[in-house]
Amino acid sequence: IQFDVGCFGFSSMPRTTPSFTSTTPNWAGSADSATAITGPDGAWRVRCFPDRSPVFRIEGPLDRSAEGLYDRMRNVGAHEVIVESREHARRPPQFSDTELADVLRLIQGRVSDLHRDPRFRYVLLFRNQGPLAGSLIEHPHSHLVATPVIPRRLEQELRWAKQHFDYKERCLACDILHQELRDGRRLVEVSPTFVAFCPFAPRFLYETWVLPRRHQHAFSRVSPDGAAGLPGLAALLRRTLARLEHLVTDYHLVLHDAPNEQAERPAG
């Protein structure tokens, strides 16, 4: 598993900084089809529900078919919104470690649930923080998208990782992490169980990776409790984002996860 953070897709700073839209959805009161983590008072702390303007539709079969040389299928998938807090305009560094751990637990539960659907080969979590990152809504939220295909970039990285393993019989991510720990110059945050660092050749401004120190390929398999689990990840992720926000206020956060092992494989 890996969290990517940074300003990818930012070609330059615009002369006029875009702003949030004035209208914020009534997420605090939305209850239909919602999954939530609640507090002792029974009120929700974090909740998730289907996006009202989804990129994909969850109903129906994929209907894969060939059209001559080309392939086609329906835009079947899932698109959900994670509302991370009841409080408007909060930024991730303003969350407590416990609050951010609750967000990660809900995400983990939704990822595991979507993996049970054999149509979905990959589940992607992304968070656009600020107008420059493409977010038009100030209320803290992220998106979860399940697709019937594996993104091309991820397929490339899986091939590179396999080539590295075939040649050296070691995990590529673990080798990179061990080298960064030995070098020390690009480390951002370090804990006994997770590490945040800037990669050797970043692809975009302020690119930062968050990796577990112990080999783990799937976010759904991280323990929901303890320093080696989601609470430890939440604490380091919050500190990392706080450091980033001393430099920029708008950025992207993406969960780099393993493909769905339970997914159907296309015939042929």
Task: Label every PLM stretch briefly.
Residues I1-G268:
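HIT superfamily nucleotide-processing domains
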